[in-house]
Design a protein with these regions (language model features):
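PLP-dependent amino-acid enzyme catalytic core
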Residues: 1-226
Length: 226
């Protein structure tokens, strides 16, 4: 199959049965392999969707600068879309995130600004605050803001969930989704609940994260969620 751009290869990721882990369980376990997306993660979907929707709304145009605070995966999806569509891209990212992510982002043409991992989101040195500061300083720059942009859950409501329904129909009892911005779990859960009202939706959250509502709030090593 021939595509006009790499962006058209985003989505329609394969689903693979997990045989070893679930062999002693009275159920079938499947994994949707989002690492098959060209940028390497599920966040390619929202990077492309946020850019497309902002263009259609007349909010951005090629040549502008896109700035995004991210743990890296959304940054890779956004940098990929920016490279194809002709935007400059600046990614603000905590120092905790892997050097490999920075290498990929730079290969896609993005400029990387590292920030202290321990900085709270409200701190002037945080990746969110630094992104806002850069947006004020750079002409024709925009923060598409994965944290509050409706295009984030919409990408999963319109595409990811539909792919799951195409593969499983109503023969699905539970879906487990990691939680970062909440866009994936929100969009997928909304659509699946419409089609399969009794489906159970489980959010995977690291120990120490505030999102799951646990008693123990502490630092953790896992990147991109929590």
């Amino acid at each position: 199959m021939i595509y006009d751009t790499i962006l058209e290869t985003i989505g329609n990721t394969p689903v693979v049965k997990i045989n070893s882990i679930g062999k002693d369980l009275n159920c079938n376990i499947f994994a949707k392999c989002e690492f098959f997306n060209p940028g390497g993660s599920v966040k390619d979907r929202i990077g492309w969707k946020m850019v497309e929707d902002a263009e259609k709304a007349g909010k951005i145009k090629p040549g502008d600068t896109l700035i995004e605070p991210t743990s890296g995966n959304t940054g890779q999806g956004l940098a990929l879309a920016a490279a194809v569509k002709g935007y400059k891209c600046i990614i603000t990212m905590p120092e905790k995130m892997s050097q490999e992510k920075q290498i990929v982002l730079e290969a896609l043409g993005a400029r990387i600004v590292r920030t202290p991992t321990e900085a709270l989101s409200s701190d002037p040195e945080s990746h969110i605050s630094v992104a806002k500061k850069l947006q004020k300083e750079i002409k024709n720059s925009h923060i598409l803001d994965q944290y509050s942009n409706p295009s984030n859950p919409d990408a999963h409501y319109q595409n990811t969930a539909e792919e799951i329904l195409k593969d499983f129909g109503e023969n699905l009892d539970m879906v487990v989704i990691s939680v970062g911005t909440g866009g994936t779990i929100t969009g997928v859960a909304k659509r699946l609940k419409e089609a399969i009202p009794n489906i159970k939706v489980v959010g995977a959250d690291p120990v120490g994260s505030i999102l799951g509502g646990g008693d123990e709030i502490s630092s953790y090593l896992v990147e991109g969620i929590g």
